[in-house]
């Protein structure tokens, strides 16, 4: 049966089971949802929608028909008339494709009203579905640009969703000899260019598609694998916004991919920021990049954000559920339910199985699980990291001692994740009087932090409590100063004042952190603190390993040696990855316990060591694939 025939059957069922007074205008597949356009959406109660979803076994979305929506400018005025001024509305975002209007205000409770009465009044007056959110304390240019693109290209986005929907809902007959295999196109026995290719007789799914920024000759996944074909690809899933997991996604669109990208909303925004930053840095350094800014926009238009815990059809036989991974904002464990109860596979991406200042720990309970693919960054026997409190004390000690002697502290960080964790520690240390110096934020850190403030529901309970109930937002502290230009960076470097500098990139592979290192390295009163993983071959690993001189390429393309006289520290307790103890604890706590466990995302020796330990401790089948290996899991 074709997708059109499937849709026609669904349309008839919905019309038959829906109240006539709802006045159904159209029923369409849009991405993973069946969208019902009606003239009177308020007729559809939650009970009716749940009943339809259960009977049809599809996600049902009820939307107002565009013909009944009040013009946005008039709608704004009506909302302002209904909502009390004390709510302090700051912005409206109208989404014509969903019929929603996001209402940003400083007091969203007043937009909702007692028992939701104000929301009901808004809905009746404008017919749009109001979605009240708290005004982000720092405005994000990335989110603004994404919203503008989706609004401007709304007709194209709708067509994209309908095309994707028809592909997802095509009718498939599941064979008796149904098989499932996973090919490892990158990130096996290495850290960088993570890329898994899941194949079944009827579906092809890519999970992550990263770039190894530290190694030019092994930068991209193995798209030359004989089984891989971009034309056959049904879906791409992104676990989180770090370049080694999402850096190549726009390149897929450049080379012919035209399907969906699934991830959480924060991941969509953060990966867009990272990809743009990667382009800009590569351009400045004269490096080739496999895509353009136009491809990043195309990627945004094809991205379908899904929330944690929401099960979504991504093909006729595969359902995807994303769960919190605890690694960075919006990071996810991808759980695939394949066939009707046939097989369940989960890929952790990068996980942190511990509550951090910023995030809750990774989820370890699933409805069903036969195979787990898990990261092994810190999987070796001696990969036991210090306690976080100990790491925080050590960080503040080094910062205090260095600034007291008039030095500058450079902390190279990933713009997403570690930077925000460190901001929280430094803000607390500054408030306690442990050090008295400004903290400069360079690279994309300020913008990444703005995106964090837009998604408070993804932060830890403690952070939400601080921001919403205690009125204390650490990200807005006076200690933080934004470095927004080359001139401002120059002033920080030339100034005699002691300070702390958080700058990207975290492994000194490019960006402002390298620029600061050039100028701070010769002076022994300065210090550099490594707080994240330094991959083999990176400048960060060389400095960390004790090199006394490092080669730096100048702007005119010549190589110059820089002496390393500054103090070098490594403080490991801030990693966003689980250490060996946490990885073992995670496997012990997994419910249900999987039959097979596959180790990836770690140096070869660490993957092998971790696999051997898990095999002995838990009596499980373990695998340590190499790149280009394929494992048949079913």
Swiss-Prot record:
Residues 576-634 are annotated as: Metallo-beta-lactamase C-terminus. Optimum temperature is 60 degrees Celsius for nuclease activity on RNA. Zn(2+) 2 binds at residues 244-245, 350, 601. Pfam families: Beta-Casp (PF10996), KH_2 (PF07650), KH_TffA (PF17214), Lactamase_B (PF00753), RMMBL (PF07521). Binds 2 Zn(2+) ions, which are required for nuclease activity. Its cofactor is Zn(2+). The keyword Zinc applies. This is Transcription termination factor FttA. GO terms for biological process: DNA-templated transcription termination. It is an enzyme of class 3 (hydrolase). GO terms for molecular function: DNA binding; exonuclease activity; metal ion binding; RNA binding; RNA endonuclease activity.
């Amino acid at each position: 049966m074709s997708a059109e025939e499937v849709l026609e059957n669904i349309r008839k069922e919905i019309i038959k089971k829906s109240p006539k007074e709802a006045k159904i205008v159209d029923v369409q597949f849009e991405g993973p949802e069946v969208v019902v356009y009606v003239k009177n959406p308020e007729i559809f109660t939650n009970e009716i929608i749940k009943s339809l979803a259960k009977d049809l076994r599809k996600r049902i979305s009820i939307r107002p028909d565009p013909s009944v929506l009040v013009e946005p400018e008039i709608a704004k005025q009506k909302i302002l008339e209904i909502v009390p001024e004390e709510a302090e509305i700051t912005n409206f975002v109208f989404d014509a494709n969903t019929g929603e209007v996001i209402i940003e205000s400083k007091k969203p409770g007043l937009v909702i009203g007692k028992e939701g009465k104000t929301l009901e009044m808004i809905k009746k007056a404008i017919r749009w579905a109001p979605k009240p959110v708290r005004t982000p304390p720092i405005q994000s240019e990335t989110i603004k640009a994404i919203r503008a693109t989706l609004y401007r290209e709304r007709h194209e986005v709708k067509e994209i969703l309908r095309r994707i929907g028809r592909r997802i809902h095509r009718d498939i007959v599941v064979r008796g000899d149904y098989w499932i295999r996973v090919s490892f196109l990158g990130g096996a026995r290495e850290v960088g260019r993570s890329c898994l290719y899941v194949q079944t007789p009827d579906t092809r799914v890519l999970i992550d598609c990263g770039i190894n920024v530290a190694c030019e000759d092994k930068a991209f996944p193995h798209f030359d694998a004989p089984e891989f074909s971009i034309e056959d690809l049904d879906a791409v899933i992104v676990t989180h916004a770090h370049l080694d997991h999402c850096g190549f996604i726009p390149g897929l669109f450049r080379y012919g991919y035209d399907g969906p990208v699934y991830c959480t909303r924060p991941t969509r925004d953060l990966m867009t920021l990272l990809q743009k930053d990667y382009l800009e840095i590569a351009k400045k350094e004269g490096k080739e990049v496999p895509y353009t800014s136009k491809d990043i926009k195309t990627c945004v238009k094809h991205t379908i954000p899904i929330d944690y815990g929401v099960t979504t059809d991504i093909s006729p036989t595969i359902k995807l559920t994303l769960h919190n991974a605890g690694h960075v904002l919006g990071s996810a464990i991808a759980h695939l339910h394949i066939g009707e109860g046939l097989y369940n596979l989960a890929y952790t991406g990068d996980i942190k199985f511990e509550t951090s200042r910023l995030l809750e720990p990774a989820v370890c309970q699933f409805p069903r699980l036969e195979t787990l693919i898990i990261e092994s960054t810190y999987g070796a026997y001696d990969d036991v990291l210090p306690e976080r409190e100990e790491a925080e004390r050590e960080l503040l000690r080094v910062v205090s001692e260095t600034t007291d002697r008039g030095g500058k502290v450079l902390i190279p960080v990933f713009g997403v994740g570690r930077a925000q964790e460190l901001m929280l520690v430094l803000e607390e240390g500054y408030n306690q009087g442990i050090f008295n110096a400004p903290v400069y934020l360079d690279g994309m850190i300020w913008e990444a932090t703005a995106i964090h403030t837009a998604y408070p529901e993804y932060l830890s309970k403690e952070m939400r409590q601080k921001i919403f109930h205690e009125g204390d937002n650490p990200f807005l502290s006076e200690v933080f100063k934004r470095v927004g230009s080359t001139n401002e960076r120059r002033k920080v470097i030339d100034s005699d004042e002691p300070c702390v500098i958080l700058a990207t990139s975290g492994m000194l592979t490019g960006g402002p952190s390298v620029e600061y290192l050039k100028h701070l390295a010769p002076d022994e009163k300065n210090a550099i603190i490594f707080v994240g993983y330094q991959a083999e071959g990176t400048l960060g690993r060389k400095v960390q390993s004790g090199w006394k001189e490092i080669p730096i390429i100048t702007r005119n393309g010549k190589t110059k040696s820089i002496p390393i006289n500054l103090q070098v520290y490594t403080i490991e307790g801030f990693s966003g990855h689980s250490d060996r103890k946490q990885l073992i604890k995670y496997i012990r706590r997994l419910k249900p316990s999987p039959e097979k466990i596959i180790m990836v995302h770690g140096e070869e020796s660490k993957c092998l060591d971790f696999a051997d330990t898990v095999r002995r401790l838990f009596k499980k089948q373990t695998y340590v694939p190499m790149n280009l290996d394929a494992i048949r899991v079913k």
